[in-house]
Amino acid sequence: MTRESESGLPIEPVYGPESLDGWDPAEKLGAPGAYPFTRGVYPSMYTGRPWTMRQYAGFGTAAESNARYKQLIANGTMGLSVAFDLPTQMGHDSDASLAHGEVGKVGVAIDSIDDMRVLFGGIPLDKVSTSMTINAPAALLLLMYQLVGEEQGVPADRLTGTIQNDVLKEYIARGTYIFPPKPSLRLIADIFKYCRTEIPKWNTISISGYHMAEAGASPAQEIAFTLADGIEYVRTAVAAGMDVDDFAPRLSFFFVARTTILEEVAKFRAARRIWARVMREEFGAKNPKSLMLRFHTQTAGVQLTAQQPEVNLVRVAVQGLGAVLGGTQSLHTNSFDEAIALPTDKSARLALRTQQVLAYETDVTATVDPFAGSYVIESMTDDVEAAAVDLMTRVEDLGGAVGAIEHGFQKGEIERSAYRVAQETDSGERVVVGVNRFQLDAEEPYEPLRVDPAIEAQQAERLARLRTERDQPAVDAALAALKKAAEGTDNVLHPMKDALRARATVGEVCNALREIWGTYVPSDAF
């Protein structure tokens, strides 16, 4: 009996040579590290070294998160990934009324350069690669990181890492936007230009499908809407006067890995192929690095369950295997208790150990793209590609990613997909172990990590002290220069850096830009 994939595509019970009738491996595959990059972006992939193990972490105060980062480094992590709390993500200071009850909850609270200095204290920034999951205020956190590097004596051209900086997906799936799309895209173009000359090894954006998938997007929707956002960013940069080959090599992507390994592997391969073709044919990119879809993967948090949470260890191992077989460049494996609370030290260590077992105790790193030529994988790759391209065409027909957002297209498609999954789970058609089958009569008690509510008062005290200690006229002058740049066409990152160096807060900098650019009001198109 034919089954349906997560994207609603048929999965046949048996595949054979006839499944690939007329299929041209030279056209569809190529060699690893060569166009169209179906088999991976590098010739040797993991045969020389494994993917980067980058565990997402951050909670409470900068000092608490700093201790967690040092522990992760001691346990063998290869890169840091910073989680920020909601006030920081929304451009509010910890003592703002809108921040009440959220300070330090889902990530670390960063209000100023003072906090950033503590966050990376004792961590040499020329020895570690850092990813920061921050979007609307991404420029601020990047500049504070650069300032901390300067204090450590690290030249900016030695800083490596990534800022997420993908605001379009915030309008679609997540909601941590600040400014309307037009100034948001202008800010992203300013970041591209700034990093090209100032921080050349920095990945300036991580175009993200993960959050759409967590909101309910199917694999085909995930890559279609993510690549459509990527096209919008490339068009914005080109319209701002940049040559595509000057910035495209620093673009990166971020996807989810579900437990459905076959379709996930097909999804990753299809995404690489589509992006390479778009960059070559639509934008005329000539640098091979401009054609490469490099991506980070995080295992699917939405598939983790609060019931029998230890079973999540198994889910995460399966998800991580799919990401590796699909050719990810870096990977975060979720902790088993994340459906309940922030990870404990033990659960975070087990999540990292899961990757280490995959890398060092299996043979998946022995050969490049082990599924190449598989009847089922190649057929599913073609099917996912066709479904994604169809969705991308529909986005283009609505005026591109921004036009489709204004019509509510992506959000509507994702909500329909999420509703289907919820219906199937409620009916029992979709089995979730421990939730609608194989339940326990009584759940075993589990003590989660709890964030101290006193953190909010501590951050407020730090802010009050900062405001009395700093040179207020210097802050005011820097914020005035920032607003002038925002009103005109000058790159806003230079005056923004001056303001942050003078100890202006995240809230103050974002409020200065709010005065000029306004704030985004969501569409009620559907």
Where do the language-model regions lie?
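Phosphate/diphosphate-binding loops
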Residues: 111, 129, 134-137, 149-151, ...
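Flexible glycine/proline-rich, aromatic-decorated loop/lid segments
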Residues: 243-247, 285-299, 307-336, 343-368, ...
